[in-house]
Amino acid sequence: KRVAPPKVDVVGASDKITQNEKLNKRINILLLGIDDGDSDAAPDEPKRTDAMMLASFDPGDNKVALLSLPRDTKVQIPGRAGWDKLNAAYAYGGVMMAKQTVANLLQVPIHYYVLVDWRAFIDVIDLIGGVDLYVEKDMYYEDPYADLVIDIKHGYQHLDGKRAGEYVRFRKDELGDIGRVQRQQKFMKAAAAQIFNIDTVTKIPALFSTVDRHVETDMNTLTMIKAANSFKLFGDEKVKSGMLYGNFDDTEGISYWATSREEVQKSLDEIGIPYMKDDEDEQE
């Protein structure tokens, strides 16, 4: 069942209580992106996640950590035999299955989720007036079946919502999905810096209200505002990002991003996300 985020009123600029609301403990949020226009999937086929990221807010150290999870990551999905790709978890069991699969992979508790389709992404970027970004190379891709043409030039660009969506979804180069994950990280940091530099945090609830048709979450209004306030107070210099370490693996005839327990722990250690240690797991 689709659950839209709670309707929120735009808080008046004089409402210091709302503006001062902050998190008092770490929370981990699983961010999932769904592409309803993905031509890789049949119209009646369950949707797979097009992007997955763990956002960890630590009010103790005033830091935010973002860990990108390649959609082809080789995982075991609860209740299924053998190996699957991480992006299949949502198709098999919805948000709860995706949360459990990521929690098992990382040995990290997932407190909340935010599921966004690309329409919401485009709307948010347009609402903040677009994002300035240095595009690392020319990008061109054409998919007539999806009525999609990506044509972004190398150099400094001002990306509106549509072109920003094309930038973060482009994967037709030598790095494939891994290159796309790297671009998503780069773009998110640039967009976050712009969003949370908006003069007043009271615009954040308005963003949620505007895109609520395209967003599903189990966070309540106050928690969303606290997370937004914390992000604004931390500043983009306190945002650390990384990608799940691993390597390409096609030994079984399927292209996976294979990772090990050691690589998972290294990924989390480098950006400061705590996880369950192996000895703690054994004691239980």
Residue ranges and their predicted role:
Residues 1-284:
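Non-catalytic, solvent-exposed segments at the cell envelope interface
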